[in-house]
């Protein structure tokens, strides 16, 4: 597993590194406005893609057991059902995308609307639909513990085509060709996935029989997917509507950095997730809860580390990377840091929940979506971008840090609300002590004179190392953290 994590980490860093250059040249040669439009398209398509309804997660979960038991008949039935689902979804997505085309000007605060935007939109739509060519293979290989193969194919294809896109941006300055490269990338991935499938999965056969178990989980996961869309894919649309498309482009540059951090987190999660499903199916609640606490305390550590370093370093990074005129104010960055923290610490709870097959808590995503949308719109009208981000924070605290953990503790671990208060109360104390100590210790090292990459690298290394060491010392107050150190560090010595 360590090898898989390291390989995944290297690929993630490489993709992100190329992505930073890609974003910089995009702004320089094509413009911040087109970048904003592109990011807006991505969020629109996420909403239209709601018709996917969480089939991917439900299908992966459904395949774990038959693959482990070598029940190839059941695997064939489930895969046939997946293919049927996604063929229908592709057609529905195309029709919805065409119907949504006339509404594009309503969401874009532009001085003039260029008709080429409609063409860009249709191509972006086709790009999303083309991913359904190979989605069943991704689901199958992931459930069969072949995630690293999926990662290889997707990563190397993306890296090659990212480089092509940068060349096109600089030499031709064409957004149209930029999108066509995305389509070609998906086609190449499909070919490689298809080859691997034909060589290694000859035991899977075509069948008209359908797996009915997916319907229940899909209905429940639909609400989780809808809530995720509203929480994670509303900000840019609201910023475009209430602020400007240029601010969308600027905020998207910050999001690119946050996405890199999220990808680093997902590197670990993507390797753990399939193994977690098997562990839960073979162990009792107490063992599962013990594992949850061990992993969760590590992600609390990472959440504070990432969010504090991001708050301290991101504006200087943006200034050196694309220019000081694209920097957001410090309070906005503070709010971004809070969201990053919650986004990091939530992933373990969500993964234990999904691996346990706990999908029927539809009240959680509905509540989260309503709170997020209402507060984001209300505060967005009053406070602009800061209000929109605050709306997301309010829903995250209410549902993700309070309501949902209580449900998971009860359903997945057989623990009551007192145990939740005890554990999360301890986390809150650790957070408060950590921030207090970090504010004191890092204060003498804060700089305002970052003018080059060398300056930033030295500054970032200093802040990151100090933050990591301070957090390590503070987290020794936690029993679960101490046990991890004893078992995985001291025993090896």
Residue ranges of each PLM-predicted region?
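Alpha-helical transmembrane segments of multi-pass membrane transport and lipid-handling proteins
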Residues: 81-110, 163-170, 191, 289-343, ...
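Interhelical loop/hinge segments that connect adjacent transmembrane helices in multipass membrane
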Residues: 1, 116, 176-178, 191-233, ...
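Interfacial/gating helices of multi-pass transporter permease domains
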Residues: 26-47, 78, 175, 213-217, ...
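Signature of the first transmembrane helix
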Residues: 1-64, 94-98, 102, 127, ...
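Membrane-interface helix-loop junctions in multi-pass transport and translocation proteins
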Residues: 27-34, 145-148, 159-190, 360, ...
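Helix-loop junctions and terminal segments of transmembrane helices
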Residues: 53-69, 142-143, 201-202, 254, ...
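Membrane-proximal transmembrane or re-entrant/amphipathic helices at the cytosolic face
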Residues: 413-417, 438-493
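Membrane-interface junctions at transmembrane-helix termini in multi-pass inner-membrane proteins
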Residues: 2, 128-156, 176, 201, ...
């Amino acid at each position: 597993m360590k090898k898989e994590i390291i390989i995944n980490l290297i690929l993630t860093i490489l993709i992100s590194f190329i992505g930073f250059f890609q974003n910089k040249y995009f702004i320089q040669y094509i413009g911040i406005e087109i970048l904003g439009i592109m990011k807006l398209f991505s969020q629109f398509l996420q909403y239209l893609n709601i018709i996917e309804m969480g089939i991917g997660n439900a299908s992966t979960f459904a395949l774990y057991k038959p693959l482990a038991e070598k029940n190839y008949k059941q695997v064939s039935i489930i895969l046939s059902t997946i293919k049927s689902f996604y063929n229908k979804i592709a057609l529905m997505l195309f029709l919805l995308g065409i119907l949504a085309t006339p509404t594009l000007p309503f969401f874009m605060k532009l001085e003039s609307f260029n008709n080429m935007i409609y063409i860009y939109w249709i191509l972006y739509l086709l790009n999303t639909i083309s991913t359904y060519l190979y989605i069943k293979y991704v689901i199958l290989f992931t459930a069969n513990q072949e995630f690293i193969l999926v990662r290889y194919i997707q990563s190397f294809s993306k890296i090659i085509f990212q480089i092509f896109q940068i060349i096109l941006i600089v030499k031709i300055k064409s957004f149209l060709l930029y999108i066509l490269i995305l389509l070609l990338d998906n086609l190449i991935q499909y070919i490689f996935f298809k080859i691997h499938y034909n060589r290694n999965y000859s035991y899977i056969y075509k069948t008209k029989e359908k797996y009915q178990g997916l319907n229940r989980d899909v209905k429940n996961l639909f609400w989780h997917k809808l809530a995720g869309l509203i929480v994670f894919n509303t900000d840019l649309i609201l910023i475009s509507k209430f602020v400007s498309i240029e601010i969308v482009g600027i905020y998207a540059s910050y999001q690119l950095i946050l996405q890199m951090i999220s990808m680093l987190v997902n590197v670990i999660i993507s390797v753990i997730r399939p193994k977690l499903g098997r562990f839960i199916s073979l162990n009792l609640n107490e063992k599962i809860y013990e594992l949850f606490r061990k992993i969760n305390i590590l992600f609390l550590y990472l959440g504070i580390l990432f969010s504090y370093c991001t708050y301290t370093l991101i504006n200087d990074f943006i200034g050196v990377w694309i220019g000081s005129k694209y920097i957001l104010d410090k309070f906005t960055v503070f709010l971004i840091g809070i969201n990053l923290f919650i986004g990091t610490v939530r992933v373990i709870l969500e993964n234990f929940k999904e691996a346990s097959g706990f999908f029927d808590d539809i009240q959680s995503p509905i509540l989260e979506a309503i709170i997020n949308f209402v507060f984001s719109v209300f505060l967005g009208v009053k406070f602009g971008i800061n209000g929109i981000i605050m709306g997301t924070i309010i829903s995250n605290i209410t549902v993700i840090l309070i309501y949902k953990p209580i449900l998971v503790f009860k359903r997945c671990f057989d623990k009551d609300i007192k145990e939740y208060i005890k554990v999360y109360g301890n986390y809150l104390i650790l957070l408060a002590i950590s921030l207090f100590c970090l504010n004191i210790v890092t204060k003498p090292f804060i700089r305002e004179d970052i003018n080059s990459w060398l300056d930033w690298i030295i500054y970032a290394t200093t802040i990151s190392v100090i933050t990591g060491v301070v957090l390590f010392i503070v987290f020794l107050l936690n029993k679960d953290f101490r046990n991890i150190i004893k078992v995985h560090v001291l025993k090896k010595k």
